[in-house]
Amino acid sequence: MNKALFLCLVVLCAAVVFAAEDLQKAKHAPFKRGAAGAAPCFCPDKVDRGDLWMFRGDCPGGYGYTSDCYVWPNICCYPH
């Protein structure tokens, strides 16, 4: 019984370590909606649509965004 519990503990620890490693390798963990990309959003002063990022204070870097507007508690980032 003790060996089985020890083995379960080792497997659980290994799973946690590998899961944490995968999260560290990720460039960014966005709350970007939609299976094919972000949900569309529209700002009052823009003609085209932007990308809706949920629960963020600013647009993430590395995606080429140059402007934004707040759709509380989310942010709409441009250009698409």
Curated annotation (Swiss-Prot):
Pfam families per record: Defensin_4
GO cellular component terms attached to this protein's record: extracellular region; nematocyst
Subcellular location: Secreted; Nematocyst
Propeptide: 20-31
GO molecular function, one term: ion channel inhibitor activity
Stretch forming the signal peptide: 1-19
Tissue expression from the record: Weakly expressed in the ectodermal tissue from the distal and proximal tentacles, body wall, and oral disk.
Protein name: Kappa-actitoxin-Avd4i
